Regions:
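Terminal, membrane-proximal amphipathic helices
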Residues: 1-103, 128-280
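Glycine-rich active-site/cofactor-binding loop and its immediate structural neighborhood
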Residues: 95-117, 121-124, 128
Length: 280
């Protein structure tokens, strides 16, 4: 008897369908805002309201600097030959968490005074972790597209226009919103190499990611602005921060791995057919 394929999801193997289900659960999971609220036992929005007036400007400046540093790392990585692995090693998520927890301890102890130093270091560690996860899912880190996709992960989960109807964007809607900026930046970098660092297309991509990433950085800083938060809770907040992006990266690059195997149309149809609610 011939196999029956009733739904798009049936075209994926059981193992790959399970992987896609796990990816959807993390990609459509509660926002960082809700995670921080759950950890701290108080709405993050109230903490944001208590931030000093100069906070937004400092956070935006630090975010831009942090993403520029990540872009420099990406441009230096491009074109380096990757060692082909039959089975890529698992990512070093725990090591990256421990490193980010250390920077969070400093941030918790010194607050906004540490921001210009802490955020670029923390963001670089998160970016390296995202790249490590991408590699574990079969991505080529010497590829322009892969590096820009890693940068784009930092823009997942934060929306600068929270009052708009589409503030809580689904994964494929958000991915589509970033796709054009990634494509134009990729073309510039492929054509101009490292000189594309200052091109309009690359600047636009950094701005697009920064507008979303800064929302989550603001939430992170608000959580660490509690009086006498100290180094311990500062480290805990940073650990939650990197865990959020590690989960986004695992989900995003799992979807991309399956798209390389089955095609984007089949994977998107299967994704939409899956119940993304957590199974407990």
């Amino acid at each position: 008897m011939e196999p029956i394929s009733i739904t798009p999801a049936a075209t994926l193997s059981p193992e790959d369908l399970d992987a896609l289900r796990r990816a959807k659960q993390v990609l459509e999971s509660p926002s960082l805002t809700m995670k921080l609220t759950g950890m701290l036992g108080a709405p993050v929005e109230k903490m944001i309201a208590r931030l000093p007036d100069f906070a937004t400007g400092k956070i935006n400046d630090a975010t831009q600097l942090a993403l520029r540093k990540c872009l420099n790392i990406a441009l230096r990585t491009l074109g380096k030959p990757q060692t082909p692995d039959a089975e890529p090693d698992k990512p070093s998520n725990l090591l990256h968490k421990l490193a980010v927890a250390t920077t969070g301890a400093a941030g918790g102890a010194f607050g906004f005074l540490a921001l210009p130093v802490e955020l670029p270091v923390t963001t670089t560690l998160i970016f390296r972790s995202v790249c490590d996860i991408a590699r574990s899912e079969g991505e080529d880190l010497g590829s322009v597209d892969t590096q820009l996709q890693c940068l784009a992960v930092l823009g997942m989960g934060g929306n600068p226009d929270k009052d708009e109807e589409d503030a809580d964007l689904g994964y494929f809607v958000l991915r589509g919103a970033l796709a054009q900026a990634i494509s134009k930046a990729s073309t510039d970098i492929t054509t101009k190499g490292i000189a594309a660092h200052s091109s309009a297309a690359v600047f636009k991509l950094v701005q697009t990611v920064a507008s979303r990433f800064s929302v989550q950085v603001t939430e992170q800083m608000a959580a660490k602005s509690i009086p006498a938060i100290g180094a311990v809770l500062g480290a805990t907040v940073n650990t939650l921060f990197i865990d959020h992006f590690q989960q986004m990266a695992h989900g995003h690059f799992t979807v991309r791995r399956l798209e390389r195997k089955y095609g984007s149309v089949a994977v998107k149809a299967a994704y939409q057919a899956i119940d993304g609610s957590p199974t407990r």
